[in-house]
Design a protein with these regions (language model features):
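Core segments of cupin and vicinal oxygen chelate
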Residues: 3, 10-52
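Vicinal oxygen chelate
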Residues: 5-14, 61-151
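Short, flexible helix/strand-to-coil boundary loops that buttress conserved ligand/catalytic motifs
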Residues: 23, 82-85, 128
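A short beta-turn/loop motif at secondary-structure boundaries
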Residues: 34, 60-61, 106-108
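Short polar/acidic secondary-structure junctions
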Residues: 46-47, 59-61
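Conserved beta-strand in the GNAT
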Residues: 52-57, 125-128
Length: 151
């Protein structure tokens, strides 16, 4: 259906306990742990509303394939991501050939992003939608460069 919303997404891990600790460190609330199935479910966003979930499934190492998903945040929240992750010992990842000293902007959306990885190598992203009109011709650039185009 065209107007359907994403309720849950899933990633794989080779060590469920390590993954649970990592996602808890990001502030996600553990909703349910099924030890016998080796899966953990976390609420995303407002856990009171129970509108989004992340499932983390333990698999054998030879079955593991890294994946990607993004957490949607506000621009103000995005600006605090480097300090938040650094305090937890999590490194930001360079992306699209650009260093991680500031967010990168996907000008076609437009959205500003920081990328990082979980302990298994799944690619994660904090993403903030920007209020300006898209400028796809700009490609991917740092936020400071994006902001200069509006001065």
């Amino acid at each position: 259906m065209k107007n359907a919303e994403l309720y849950e997404t899933h990633v794989k891990t080779v060590n469920l306990e390590s993954a649970v600790a990592f996602y808890k460190s990001l502030g996600l609330e553990l909703a349910y742990l099924l030890e016998e199935r080796r899966v953990a479910f976390f609420y995303l966003g407002d856990s009171e509303k129970k509108q989004q979930m992340l499932g983390v499934w333990e698999v054998k190492e030879h079955e593991f394939v890294p994946s990607h998903f993004a957490f949607k945040v506000t621009v103000e929240q995005l600006r605090s991501v480097p300090q938040l992750l650094e305090a937890k010992g999590i490194a930001l990842s360079p992306s699209f050939g650009l260093h991680a000293s500031e967010p990168v902007v996907h000008a076609w959306m437009p959205a500003a992003c920081y990328y990082f990885s979980d302990p298994d190598g799944n690619s994660l992203e904090y993403l903030a939608l920007l209020d300006q009109e898209p400028k796809p011709e700009l490609g991917v650039l740092h936020l400071s460069e994006w902001e200069k185009t509006f001065q």
